[in-house]
């Protein structure tokens, strides 16, 4: 199968996020983990999502609501805006923009995700939502002002 990876890397799924979602390897960077989590959302892979959350998040507590959302949500694209690994090498950030539809309504997620590495394995811990001014360039990458693009939704 030579299918491109849903994460938008332009690599084949079998050499990009596929090994992570099949359980054969762990992502070695925060960006690789974020991309694999995007794939897990797109493929409705609840076990992978739960396993990739930091244990302190107690992700099992909201597994049922997450699984319920799968039937109404479709993921349409991912754009990585920036990545950063702090000098301690165990904390990383990935800012991204993802398009999705929920109950057939187009929407997007613009997040700065935080990742922690413990025992050589990266975990998602939480995320914040960077503010976007109406006259800023839209984080979707269109080149338009936010108010003329995704800010209209």
From Swiss-Prot:
Recorded family membership: Belongs to the UPF0225 family.
Annotated protein name in UniProt: UPF0225 protein ETA_15740
NCBIfam families tied to this protein: PRK01617.1 (NF002449), PRK01752.1 (NF002486)
Chain ranges passing through the membrane: none
Pfam family membership, one: YchJ_M-like
Top-rank taxon: Bacteria
InterPro entries given in the database record: NTF2-like_dom_sf (IPR032710), SEC_C_motif (IPR004027), UPF0225 (IPR023006), YchJ-like_M (IPR048469)
PANTHER family found in the cross-reference section: ADENYLATE CYCLASE-ASSOCIATED CAP C-TERMINAL DOMAIN-CONTAINING PROTEIN, UPF0225 PROTEIN SCO1677
């Amino acid at each position: 199968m030579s299918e491109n990876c849903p994460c938008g890397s332009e690599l084949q799924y079998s050499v990009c996020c596929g090994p992570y979602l099949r359980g054969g390897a762990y992502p070695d960077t925060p960006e690789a983990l974020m991309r694999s989590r995007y794939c897990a959302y797109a493929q409705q892979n609840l076990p992978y999502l739960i396993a990739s959350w930091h244990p302190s998040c107690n992700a099992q507590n909201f597994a049922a609501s997450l699984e319920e959302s799968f039937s109404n949500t479709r993921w349409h694209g991912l754009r990585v805006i920036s990545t950063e690994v702090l000098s301690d090498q165990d904390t990383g950030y990935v800012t991204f923009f993802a398009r999705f539809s929920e109950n057939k309504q187009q929407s997007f997620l613009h997040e700065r995700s935080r990742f922690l590495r413990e025992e050589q394995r990266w975990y998602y811990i939480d995320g914040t939502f960077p503010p976007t001014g109406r006259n800023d360039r839209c984080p979707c990458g269109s080149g338009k002002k936010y108010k003329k693009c995704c800010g209209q939704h």
